């Protein structure tokens, strides 16, 4: 979408240069290959399936999220390996289990 006047945009919104995004993502993927590691982008800023796919070279690979709402959104789009990057509290475990069962995915946890 091309916008001539930034004041016309509904906020909050994400504004980015797709060419720069693609170059940065390519550089990150190449660096991970050099280090023999897996890229697991944190998608909390973009909250975008399209951007997650650009980051992962159009693959449905591992991602990192900050909310269970984000986890469910990406699970519904076919992402199967999701890291929930904040400490979980017991009352959220039911929803986490629901997401895993409904979308046949794995939501990994970080415990502190």
Where are these regions (language model features)?
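A generic structural signal for short, solvent-exposed coil/turn residues
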Residues: 8, 31-33, 101
């Amino acid at each position: 979408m091309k916008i001539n006047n930034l004041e016309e945009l509904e906020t909050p919104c994400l504004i980015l240069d797709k060419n720069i995004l693609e170059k940065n993502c390519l550089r990150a993927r190449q660096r991970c290959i050099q280090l023999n590691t897996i890229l697991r982008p944190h998608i909390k800023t973009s909250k975008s399936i399209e951007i997650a796919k650009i980051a992962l070279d159009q693959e449905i690979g591992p991602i990192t999220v900050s909310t269970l709402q984000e986890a469910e959104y990406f699970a519904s789009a076919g992402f199967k390996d999701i890291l929930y990057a904040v400490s979980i509290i017991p009352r959220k475990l039911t929803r986490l289990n629901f997401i895993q069962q409904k979308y046949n995915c794995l939501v990994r946890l970080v415990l502190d």
